[in-house]
Amino acid sequence: MKSHYPPLDVTQLRAGYQKGRDVVKGISLQALAGSVTTLIGPNGCGKSTLLKSMSKVLAPSEGSVSVNGESIHHLTATEAARLVSMLPQHPVAPEGLQVGELVARGRHPWRRRFGGLSKTDQQAVARACTETNIAHLVDRSVDSLSGGQRQRVWLAMILAQDTPVILLDEPTTFLDPANAIAMLQLIRRQAEAGKIVVMVLHDLTLASQYSDSIFIMKAGEVISEGRPKEAFTPDVLAHAYGLHAEVWDDPTSSGPVIVPRGLSESSEGINLKPLS
């Protein structure tokens, strides 16, 4: 059942890591409840910086991120953590931490100041473990798991946090194709349950198949946006990536299939460093 939760509004956002050197340059977007919004673009274009700025991880230099007219950056840390959860690109768990303990950390914004997990907390943790198919791993240490298992554990922690807004930076990292699709199907179910989901992906076809809205970035700016069939065009892919690609309609889904054919004629190519 879809929620009537207000959208997440990003307005003329500028953000970076050094004063006067913005990585994100005046971006505006709206992410709706019940939908998956995906940010894509070449390495270094500002996707992760934008995602961090949509939580309290990174304060913008200008602009706003708001829900129902209230700026996320004006909330307390606890208030923001009850509204927005974020899975960064390379999360690190303390050595020896058990899976169940890590997932339970998602309940931190909701826990009483003193005492253990409440019944509501325990139910949220159990539900998240079941949904991500890691219930059989709860007594294992996180560092004993494969990369794909760890990624599902981190997502379980985010789901246990039970926020209306979920931000995911490359959630299919370390996953083989079958597990990547399973992960994206799980993410889609969060949107179908009424959540606002914003994620960063690199796989163009997966982004097309599992997103409701696409924002394609280059050099800190959005150069194309809309539903996948609208956002992905050969000209846009050439501009964003220097890529010659064909965009095919997929009669079985709402998103197109992107078929790379090489570098575009205008591309300067990618300079790779020699291996030492």
Predicted region positions:
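Helix-to-loop junction immediately C-terminal to a conserved catalytic motif
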Residues: 55
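Conserved ABC ATPase signature
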Residues: 116, 141-145
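Catalytic Walker B motif of ABC-type/P-loop ATPase nucleotide-binding domains
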Residues: 166-170
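The feature captures the beta-strand-to-loop junction immediately N-terminal to the Walker
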Residues: 40-42
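ABC ATPase nucleotide-binding domains
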Residues: 240-276
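Conserved ABC transporter NBD signature motif
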Residues: 63-71, 80
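A short, flexible loop at the N-terminus of ABC-type nucleotide-binding domains that lies
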Residues: 1-10, 14-26, 33, 74-76, ...
